[in-house]
Amino acid sequence: MTPTRRLFLGLAPLLAAPALAQGTPLRCAVGPFQPTAGDTRRAYEPFFTHLARAVGRPLDLTVTTDWAGIAVALANEQVDVAWMGPWGYILAKDRAKAEALAVVQYQGKPTYQAIIIARPDLAIARFPEDAKGMSISFADAGSTSGWLIPHYWFRTQGIDPRSYFRYRDGASHPANDLAVATGQVDLATDYDRNLAAMIAAGRLREDQVKIVWRSEPLPNDALAVRDRLDPGLKSALREAALGIDAASASRIMPANYTGWVPAQPDSYAMIEAAGRAVGRIGGG
């Protein structure tokens, strides 16, 4: 055996140690923001690739099929970091002490609105009075704008949507939009960002639906991490997200997202209060 060969073999264990450390995947997850899982992966993978590269790890990205599932995965420590809706984050925080690192900005704003859309031919001058008895599709129970906030608002009006309407739930937001546009249901829950994205992508025409209700401004999606994540990794992820400026966001984030701002202790307080009010987390 040559001296060079012996030297290489002697160094091999030392070289393998950092390689193994760097080979631990960063387990990321994102909810069903786009019409299909493939669409969501294509839109959000560049952002998660940026995070993984920033912390020196390979990427393992999961696209969930519903909003509740992403909260469960984070709570069960199957995921390290997730881009998730506000209500999903609160569920994971309540169940397993998940922590929000940052709040996403959309067109420079950290807020959005829940909406209820209707078929454009329906005579709805007053909502919900004129819509009583109509069919309505809610999103799954892990959705902020598609489930929690509409349920909470109806509760403040003394209305149970399950008996006031012909009620169903469990749909994705894109599916809700298309169900209204094609006349499968009269009404559906959604959020303003999604409706705008569907129209911009040509999946929906603006004249195929009309908005009959809007919520107050809600905090945008969270970049959240699981409990007991290494503090150094958590700090590096936060810095990687907050370091994205508008120019970088245009390359690595979906259209119209412009970066992140730090999450504060009260960033999602209104979502947590709504969850308690409808009895979905403790203290309601």
Can you name each region flagged by the protein language model?
Residues 7-21:
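N-terminal export signals
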Residues 25-54, 87, 110-177, 187, ...:
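Bilobed "Venus flytrap"/periplasmic-binding protein-like clamshell domains
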Residues 29-33, 106-115, 203-241, 255-274:
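Periplasmic-binding protein-like
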Residues 59-65, 163-172, 210-213:
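Short beta-strand-to-loop elements that line the ligand-binding cleft
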Residues 68-82, 95, 129, 173-193:
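Short helices/loops that flank or line small-molecule/ion binding pockets
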Residues 71-130:
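Acidic, polar ligand-binding/catalytic clefts
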Residues 86-96, 153-156, 181, 186-206:
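A ligand-binding cleft/hinge motif common to bilobed small-molecule-binding domains
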Residues 138-153, 241-284:
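Ligand-binding clefts/hinges and TM-proximal coupling segments of bilobed small-molecule sensing domains
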